[in-house]
Amino acid sequence: MIPTEDASARKREIEEKLKQEQETLSFIRESLEKSDQLTKGMVSILSSFESRLMQLENSIIPVHKQTENLQRLQENVDKTLSNMDHVISYYHVAKDTDKIIREGPAGRLYEYLACIAKIQKAVEYFQDNNPDSPELNTVKARFEKGKELLEAEFRSLLTRYSKPVPPVLILDAIGGDEDMEVQEEVTLEHLPEAVLQDIICISAWLVEYGRNQDFMNVYFQVRSSQLDRSIKGLKEHFRKNSATSAIHSPAVQTKRKETPTKKAPKRPVYIPGTIRKAQNLLKQYSQHGLDGKKGSNLTPLEGFEHDLRGVKHLSDEKHGATAGKDDVLDIEIDSYIHCISAFVKLAQSEYALLTEIIPEHHQKKTFDSLIQEALDNLMLEGDNIVSAARRAIMRHDYSAVLTIFPILRHLKQTKPDFDATLQGTAASTKNKLPALITSMETIGAKALEEFADSIKNDPDKEYNMPKDGTVHELTSNAILFLQQLLDFQETAGAMLASQVLGDTYNIPLDPRESSSSASSYSSEFSRKLLSTYIYKVLGNLQLNLSNKAKVYEDPALRAIFLHNNYNYILKSLEKSELIQLVAVTVKKVESSYRELIEQEIQNYQRSWLRVTEHLAERNIPDFQPGAKLKDKERQIIKDKFKGFNDGLEELCKIQKGWAVPDKEQRDTIRHAQKRVVSLTYKAFLQRCANISFTKNPEKYHRYSPEQVEDMIDRLFDTSA
């Protein structure tokens, strides 16, 4: 059982908690009553506010709607007035723009274009809203007038500011200073920048609103004229400077540039001196070879210390008469080569300018028309060169082909740039340069073939043969012609390849090359073809010289003649690069000529047999020293002395006037002859030393061995 005290305490505790809970409950009940009262008050206030708000809305909304309507009406009135003003302005456009249109766009292009824009809008308005109004005709006429003045301004700006490019600037553009390690790109400015921007602006307007292409015709006509004038100015520059060597071009100072492995130089390269020399000499032979003159026109090679005996060079008078023409020819060729490069550079510059002014879909056609005049003039000049060469070749003047070589080489070097520049033009335009190249290759190959045939078939003329047996002019001119080919090896080889395809010379094509076009044969094949051609010319020359030598009645002179010519050919081949070029296909050409030279020396030495045979031991009886000779035996010895003396004197007299220009060969021949004759003569004298065959020995023993050697030393020397 729970103790009584604890129960009482517990009871009191519970009663106290109950009392507290009752007090809390009473507080909550009072709070709820107050909250209900506040809620009822708030609901009453909100209900009153809503009622008043509805009353206010009912009074304000009608006023708002009325105000909104009034504002809309005001806006409509303003828009109507604005539109009326705008429409009325169209009726005044003609009057407002009259002064500016009449004065034209010069000096105020953008203001003028703004006026044109106003007129155009007026035209569009009347066309859409009142097509029958007289105002439409007025603004239309004003618009057409404005467009005409814009086109006139376009023409005026182009004409006024388009100037030919100065020749010096063109030469800088196509070549630059080759002495400079870093070449700066030369920019050709055809129009001032401000003028160019005006022209571009006018062009853009005419394209968009002008609705015609007349301005494009104007553009190509004006620029075409300036392009042609620029090229003609370059030609005139060369002509004016032809009297000096200081032309702004490296052509006259440049050494040979083209080899089969070297890259072509950037600036056109031409070697006037070699062409002029070759043409001078070859023309003299081809045109005056039948006038009775003889000898070679070629300057002696190293080792030929005397002028070739019997050679008649061009007289000063004759040379002076032709020198001017040769200089003109040099300038014309150099000029044409540079004009081709100038055309490409100027055409590239013109196209760059054109792309800023002419619409893209009209650019190629306009460019095609723009370049036609200058291109046609260049092609016509090239055709004239070909025609002149063709006429010269018909006259057997094969030196004319030397004019074609530098031009053809440059045309082929320029062709890639030419094709790239003319990309997109008409086929007839793009084919003009290839057609000229083909024409030059055809006439050049024909000239080379006919030259080879002419060497073989050159007639044997006694009066045209050198009396002293020196180098024949056919030899010197043939070698000179071949030496000129060294400057144009790739060009000449490709020229032959493009025409004969190797069949003429039995050179097989590489299978990889057989499908290529004629203009794309490998450099190696062209070099082989040229090597074979040169060997063919040398073979024809050798055959012709053998035939010509038969004109000489004296076998010794015949041998000297062939010796001189063969030696000259060999020396020329060795001095130039011809020997290496021929060796491409024929390895033993040098040894062949040395054998021929040695053979002719031996043939010449046989002429001395009629001298030394008198000293031969046959028919000479055995003599005993101090023995008395019979009359017949004495006469034999006398006849041998007399035969030797007369033969020696006769040969020395005749052969003294002959020529062996090569000092080394001359000394070799003399030395060999001295050795043979002197030994034979000394042996004969020694045998007859103690024999008394005459009372006057000095009558028969005229020359000592030393004197004989001295006489032989004076052979081939007219001054001795």
Swiss-Prot record:
Q: Does the keyword Cell membrane apply?
A: yes
Record keywords: Cell membrane, Coiled coil, Cytoplasm, Exocytosis, Membrane, Phosphoprotein, Protein transport, Transport
Q: Where in the cell is it found?
A: Cytoplasm, Cytosol; Cell membrane; Midbody, Midbody ring
Q: Which domain of life is it from?
A: Eukaryota
Q: Where are the transmembrane segments?
A: none
Q: Which InterPro entries match?
A: Cullin_repeat-like_dom_sf (IPR016159), Exo70 (IPR004140), Exo70_C (IPR046364)
Write out the GO MF terms.
phosphatidylinositol-4,5-bisphosphate binding
Its record classes its membrane topology as: Peripheral membrane protein
Which cysteine pairs are covalently linked by disulfides here?
Answer: none
Q: What is this protein called?
A: Exocyst complex component 7
Q: Which lineage is the organism of this entry classified under, starting from the top rank?
A: Eukaryota, Metazoa, Chordata, Craniata, Vertebrata
